[in-house]
């Protein structure tokens, strides 16, 4: 499996994401935001956490209009896989690849801690390494992670089994406790928690490993 990790000015989790992909058996190529084309043969694109372009204007808004994001959108529209984590989730909502928006945390404070997530569905390449209903421990680190969408969108996400993860005790005010969602074809995942920070026992947790291993296995079998 070949993964491309996009790097913006202000990204700070691109190395962590690359290491998690590599540990799961993927080949990784870093892609700069000014690039216009993806590497040949890319199976999945990872958009990492951080503070792209300093979070100016709106989190993820400037990054979403960078040259590489046109190729990311085209990849997704062709049925390619994309994962956006934290700031990457914000970028995916700004590009329109995922619905909703990430607002300022309800408590108006930056939150950095490990939280309990409930796996809502195992019916995707990202989550098939878990069982629906599992509780996993994954770190969060964000100031604008409060997921919001109108009631109709929330109902559609829930009705189509597109809510991937929810918080067991919502830290940021996210509507319907949503921590991560899937696209309509289930090949784009956006999530605020950081599974790449829970993919090595030396870092204090391994609950994120199953996501990367399942994804690598699913794409290798295609």
Swiss-Prot record:
Gene Ontology molecular functions: ATP binding; glutaminase activity; phosphoribosylformylglycinamidine synthase activity
Gene3D superfamilies to which the protein is assigned, alphabetical: 3.40.50.880
Keyword Cell inner membrane belongs to the record: no
Residue stretches making up the Glutamine amidotransferase type-1 domain: 3-222
Record organism: Roseobacter denitrificans (strain ATCC 33942 / OCh 114)
Major subcellular site: cytoplasm
Enzymatic reactions: N(2)-formyl-N(1)-(5-phospho-beta-D-ribosyl)glycinamide + L-glutamine + ATP + H2O = 2-formamido-N(1)-(5-O-phospho-beta-D-ribosyl)acetamidine + L-glutamate + ADP + phosphate + H(+); L-glutamine + H2O = L-glutamate + NH4(+)
Keywords tagged on the record: ATP-binding, Cytoplasm, Glutamine amidotransferase, Hydrolase, Ligase, Nucleotide-binding, Purine biosynthesis
PROSITE patterns hit by this protein: GATASE_TYPE_1 (PS51273)
Pathway(s) of this molecule: Purine metabolism; IMP biosynthesis via de novo pathway; 5-amino-1-(5-phospho-D-ribosyl)imidazole from N(2)-formyl-N(1)-(5-phospho-D-ribosyl)glycinamide: step 1/2
CDD domains: GATase1_FGAR_AT
Pfam family, any one: GATase_5
EC number assigned by the record: 6.3.5.3, 3.5.1.2
Catalytic-site annotation from UniProt: 86 (nucleophile), 194, 196
SUPFAM superfamilies reported in the protein's UniProt record: Class I glutamine amidotransferase-like (SSF52317)
HAMAP family given in the database record: PurQ
The protein's role, per its UniProt record: Part of the phosphoribosylformylglycinamidine synthase complex involved in the purines biosynthetic pathway. Catalyzes the ATP-dependent conversion of formylglycinamide ribonucleotide (FGAR) and glutamine to yield formylglycinamidine ribonucleotide (FGAM) and glutamate. The FGAM synthase complex is composed of three subunits. PurQ produces an ammonia molecule by converting glutamine to glutamate. PurL transfers the ammonia molecule to FGAR to form FGAM in an ATP-dependent manner.
GO BP term, pick one: 'de novo' IMP biosynthetic process
Localisation: Cytoplasm
GO cellular component term of the entry, any: cytoplasm
Oligomeric and partner information: Part of the FGAM synthase complex composed of 1 PurL, 1 PurQ and 2 PurS subunits.
Full protein name: Phosphoribosylformylglycinamidine synthase subunit PurQ
């Amino acid at each position: 499996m070949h993964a491309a990790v996009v790097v913006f000015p202000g990204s700070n989790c691109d190395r962590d994401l690359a290491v998690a992909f590599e540990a799961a058996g993927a080949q990784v190529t870093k892609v700069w935001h000014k690039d216009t084309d993806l590497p040949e043969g890319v199976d999945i694109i990872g958009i990492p956490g951080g503070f792209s372009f300093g979070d100016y204007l709106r989190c993820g808004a400037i990054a979403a209009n960078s040259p590489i994001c046109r190729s990311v959108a085209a990849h997704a529209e062709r049925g390619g896989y994309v994962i956006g984590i934290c700031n990457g989730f914000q970028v995916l909502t700004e590009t329109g690849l995922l619905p909703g928006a990430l607002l300022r945390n309800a408590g108006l404070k930056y939150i950095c801690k490990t939280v309990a997530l409930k796996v809502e569905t195992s019916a995707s390449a990202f989550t098939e390494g878990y069982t629906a209903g599992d509780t996993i421990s994954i770190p969060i680190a964000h100031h604008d992670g409060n997921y919001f969408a109108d009631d109709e969108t929330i109902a559609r996400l829930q009705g189509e089994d597109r809510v991937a993860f929810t918080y067991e005790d919502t830290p940021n005010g996210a509507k319907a406790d949503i921590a991560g969602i899937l696209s309509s074809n289930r090949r784009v995942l956006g999530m605020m928690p950081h599974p790449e920070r829970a993919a090595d026992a030396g870092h204090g947790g391994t609950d994120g490993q199953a996501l990367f291993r399942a994804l690598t296995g699913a794409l290798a079998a295609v």
